[in-house]
Every structure is written in C-alpha cells, then in structure tokens.
Amino acid sequence: MFRCLMQNHQRRALVLFSGGQDSTTCLAWALERYAHVETLGFDYGQRHRVELDARQVVLRELRANFPDWAQRLGDDHLLDLGILAQVGDTAMTSDREIEMQANGLPNTFVPGRNLLFLTLAAALGYRRQLDVLVGGMCETDFSGYPDCRDDTIKSQQVTLGLGLGTRVTIETPLMWLDKAQTWELADRLGGQALVDMVIEHSHTCYLGERGQRHDWGYGCGHCPACALRKNGWERWVAGAAHAD
C-alpha cells in the first residue's frame, strides 16, 4: 500500500506545507526519506488563514517531539500570493457559501493554484538546491480539482524540468490514498505522537474554525474538508479496531 521509506541521502526536498493534515503527513514522509527537507507555504488571502499559524505550531512540535526529524528539517519559507484572490474569486478567498458550480467543480477551486504553487516551489528549489518537490495532491478523496490529478502533476514535472534545464521530481505520496489511509500513514510514520499532533495542531477546515474540537481535530465539521477528514478518521479507527 505504501511506498518504501528508505532514506535517500543524495537528494534534498522541498515540501509544500500548508499546515493541514495532508501536508503535515507529507512532511513527515519526506523527513523519514530525505536527509534535508525545507518547507514552503503560501499566503494567498485564504479564508482559513489560521492554517498559516498552524504551520508554525506543527513545525515547532515536529522539532520538539521527533529529534531525528528535527536534524533534517531545514528552513521554512512563506510566499505572498495575494494576487490569487484577484485572479480567482472563490469561496476559498471570500466569505461566501460553499457550493457546487455548473461545471461540476465546487466553488472552493482556485484556478491554477497548484500549478502556480509548484512553479514557485521549483524556482525556490532551484535556488536552494532542492530537487525534490513534495505535495499532498490526491486523486482518491478529493473534490474534483483538476490540478490535483496525477496526469496534471506528471505533466507539470516534465514542464518544470524542461523550463529549468535540470532534473525536477514531484513526489505525491498521498496520490492514491484515501483519507483513512492517510491517517494510517501518519500512524506508520510517527506513531500515536504524530497522529495526536495532526489532531491537535494541523488545520483543515475551509471556514477557519478552531473553536470546535472533535475526535479528529478542530473544524466546523460540515465543510467538504472537514467531512473528508472526519470520514477518513472514522473509517481508520473502525478498521484499526477491527484489526485488533
């Protein structure tokens, strides 16, 4: 089910790190695999800006609770992408009800977001000599975003390599995992300590709700992001209980 987590001491990684469940799990995956890992976040006027605070808390907790990973965890970077709110007026960047659109996509879809994220990550990685990009894109439990599809990511990898004239690898460890399997991967990587950290400190809720605590973490409990996280948690817990 999961890829082998052998360390690769020859390559350096840059993780697209929002502070959410998926990117936190991807960060742990990269820290287990690579000798040097840096993180990159984006401030694009997102409605759930609390995730920017969550990023720092997760990084702090990782350093404090996982000393081996702390030795491999390098600099954190944050880029201002306020222009995305101007280009794509969506429920992710404005106070409006989350709903499906006529094109079959939810209005939380920010056009070109992941394409821009990966382009900027590759440019930063080029300067920092980080030739592996790690992202939490996923085709299994996702909202239909076209820039999360495996074909999109593979195409972007080729384009970035050609445009930069160097080898670029985009790793997507969650691409074929559902949310229950993402919880399972976190447990496999860091045990209960990492699972607890994801619950307490990562942020997923599109509405930025941090006042309501659930078994699976904080959030409104109703938005699409919360629903995926909640359902994945319940399926993982049920599966673990059945295995016992």
From Swiss-Prot:
Q: Which GO terms describe its biological process?
A: queuosine biosynthetic process
Does the record bear Metal-binding in its keywords? yes
Cofactor note text: Binds 1 zinc ion per subunit.
Which EC number(s) are documented for this chain? 6.3.4.20
Pfam family example for this protein?
QueC
Binding residues for ATP: F17, S18, G19, G20, Q21, D22, S23, T24, T25, C26, L27
Q: What pathway is this protein a component of?
A: Purine metabolism; 7-cyano-7-deazaguanine biosynthesis
Q: Which UniProt keywords apply?
A: ATP-binding, Ligase, Metal-binding, Nucleotide-binding, Queuosine biosynthesis, Zinc
Kindly give the CDD domains that the UniProt entry links to this protein. QueC-like
Enzyme class, UniProt record, top EC level: ligase
Role summary? Catalyzes the ATP-dependent conversion of 7-carboxy-7-deazaguanine (CDG) to 7-cyano-7-deazaguanine (preQ(0)).
What family does the Swiss-Prot or TrEMBL record give for this protein? Belongs to the QueC family.
Q: What is this protein called?
A: 7-cyano-7-deazaguanine synthase
The organism is: Bordetella pertussis (strain Tohama I / ATCC BAA-589 / NCTC 13251)
